[in-house]
Amino acid sequence: MIAELVFVGTELLLGEILNTNAQYLSRQLAQLGVDVYHQVVVGDNAARLRAVLSQALSRSDLVIASGGLGPTDDDITREVAAEVTGRPLELDPQLLAQLEIWFARRGRRMAENNRRQCMVPRGARVLPNDRGTAPGLMIPADGDKVVILLPGPPGELRPMFEAHVAPYLAARSGGRPLRLVTRTLRFVGIGESALADGLRDLMATQTDPTIAPYAKVAEVHLRLATRAADEAEGYARIAPLEAEIRSRFGRFLYGSDEETLPQAVGRLLAERGMTLSTAESCTGGLVAKWITDVPGSSRYFGTGFVTYANEAKVSLLGVPEELLSAHGAVSEPVARAMAEGALQRSGADVAVAVSGIAGPDGGTPEKPVGTVCFALAGRGRQGGGPLPAGTWAETLWLHGDRDGVRERAAVHALAMVRRYLLGYLD
């Protein structure tokens, strides 16, 4: 079954409202084995909505439209859908009585324009709305096609979809539909183009499962996807491809599916029984925040230093003033001293430090905005896989605005810790 999603509302086009319904409906339909080929956002204009719905019905079996079911003049979805499907609107007395009761129970008088919400295309099925006044509608179209209208507010759309639309689609499939099963592999320390180049042969011949790379902030994700009757069958089909990718790029692969980089680093620290400390300047505590966002992080994280000013670097971390004078705060020697000071003063097993120029000001020709210095100091470890003692430093030039530089720096700091714990830091 091929579906098209239509989202109605000028506020969506203006960016005043985030269209979370698009993500929700796409995910739900994928789980039901329904292919979504198109998504369209259209404003509150009858002519344009008429054209969009007509085109959708010409190329899809199922059209789901959300929004525009309210009582005001710009709520036009019901009327336009009735026109496009050739089904005249008729007042539903039962729906009207229910709506009058809904208002009476809340001590409110029903306005005359609310009667519009009780107009139903002839032959359509009404989908009850337990959260609001706008019922959904399931309207038959030419052939075996159907147009489903859902309210725009997510708090009304989601329960209506789950209670009425999902069971209808499952029954319509005539058995166990093939569902979309995916595995997301998460990489750090490698770019999208380099990863894609190393998988060129696999991507050139992909049929089932499919491979789709997409870039995130300082990360790359690979989505492996197949259709199967259930998750077990799907994951079994994905497993050989995943194993091949891991054999090629396991050094950069930190996790899968919903595991984040802070979770992956925390898992490695916990497995080794080690603790981490942070010393941050330009990131302002972002690395420590991400680490402590993970429940149970107190097992491996105890101390984080935010030393934004040079005075704080000296007093809290013991960075020598002459080092700051000679090299500047954004330098590998200072980053090394920050990491070593955090290691010594926290008692942790490993410490990571970040010092950079996030912008928009502060850059120079020698050290432009985006220059970030990193350092990691480790005490070393013999058991559970030996780790060397020492201090390592590196410098990156990161792109983006102030927040972008800070976020990319935080990702790289965590990636540096991961590399050390896995023995890749050299």
UniProtKB/Swiss-Prot annotation:
Pfam families from the entry?
A: CinA, CinA_KH, MoCF_biosynth
Under the heading CDD domains, the entry gives: cinA (cd00885)
Check the record and name the SMART domains matching this protein. Answer: MoCF_biosynth (SM00852)
> What InterPro entries does its record include?
CinA (IPR050101), CinA-like_C (IPR036653), CinA_C (IPR008136), CinA_KH (IPR041424), Competence-induced_CinA (IPR008135), MoaB/Mog-like_dom_sf (IPR036425), MoaB/Mog_dom (IPR001453)
Question: What does the sequence similarity comment in the record state about its family?
Answer: Belongs to the CinA family.
Cross-referenced NCBIfam families, in alphabetical order? cinA_nterm, molyb_syn, PncC_domain, PRK00549.1
**Protein name, per record:** Putative competence-damage inducible protein
Q: Which organism is it from?
A: Symbiobacterium thermophilum (strain DSM 24528 / JCM 14929 / IAM 14863 / T)
Q: Which gene encodes it?
A: cinA
